[in-house]
């Protein structure tokens, strides 16, 4: 499971609690609970799979879920989003270090996951609801795309779509102005056509 986990991450099967059947006994024995934080599902799932050595994958559907909230968390501006993504990346690195798995395919997935979410961090800054000044936005974006992890992961990541390759170019070039311009377009699509945005996001 551990050496193939990158495939399940890429198939979006290891991020959220749904699409899974957990052993209640396993969860209770280890005292695993959802942490008191926003985006609490991801750290919970990581805590469950941390010491798991085998999983079973089935094509059958055993339950359905419904989710409803007043506002999508992906559409809201969050001043600490970048810090949260940095924290998540640390969790992924820690998980793979704990597993003793450092092969090229796994590390590429971890790096690609990180840089794809950097795009979201930049879009968060160009979001119309962002309260930063124009110069404040430039400074924040410069910090995001020029960070140590960003530069390292951009070298390791191999985007799977032409769209994502194109989106990452300004970030690779460390070009703040072009990155901001591109991100404003993304923000516009996100705010005006959420269905199109979700479709494009799914095809990244």
PLM-predicted stretches and their roles:
Residues 1-81:
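Donor-binding/catalytic cores of nucleotide-activated saccharide
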Residues 1-4, 88, 114, 137:
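Alpha-helical structural motif
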Residues 34, 99-105:
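Inter-helical turn/loop segments and adjacent helix faces that build the functional surface
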Residues 60-69, 75-101, 120, 124, ...:
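Catalytic core of nucleotide-sugar-dependent glycosyltransferases
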Residues 83, 87, 105-113:
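Residues within HEAT/ARM-like alpha-solenoid scaffolds
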Residues 109-123:
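Amphipathic alpha-helical repeat scaffolds of TPR domains
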Residues 127-204:
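Membrane-interface aromatic/basic loop that binds lipid-linked glycans or pyrophosphate carriers
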């Amino acid at each position: 499971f551990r050496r193939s986990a990158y495939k399940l991450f890429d198939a979006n099967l290891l991020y959220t609690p749904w699409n899974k059947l957990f052993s209640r006994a396993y969860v209770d024995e280890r005292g695993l609970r959802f942490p008191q934080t926003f985006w609490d599902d991801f750290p919970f799932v990581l805590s469950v799979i941390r010491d798991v050595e085998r999983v079973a994958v089935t094509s059958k559907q055993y339950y359905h879920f419904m989710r409803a909230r007043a506002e999508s968390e992906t559409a809201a501006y969050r001043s600490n989003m970048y810090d949260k993504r940095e924290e998540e990346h640390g969790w992924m690195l820690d998980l793979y270090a704990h597993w003793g798995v450092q092969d090229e395919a796994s590390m590429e997935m971890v790096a690609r996951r990180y840089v794809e979410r950097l795009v979201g961090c930049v879009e968060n800054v160009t979001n119309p609801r962002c309260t930063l000044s124009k110069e404040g936005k430039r400074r924040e974006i410069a910090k995001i795309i020029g960070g140590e992890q960003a530069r390292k992961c951009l070298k390791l990541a191999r985007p799977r779509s032409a769209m994502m390759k194109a989106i990452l170019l300004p970030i690779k070039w460390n070009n703040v102005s072009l990155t901001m311009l591109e991100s404003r377009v993304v923000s516009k699509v996100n705010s005006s056509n959420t269905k199109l945005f979700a479709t494009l996001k799914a095809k990244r």
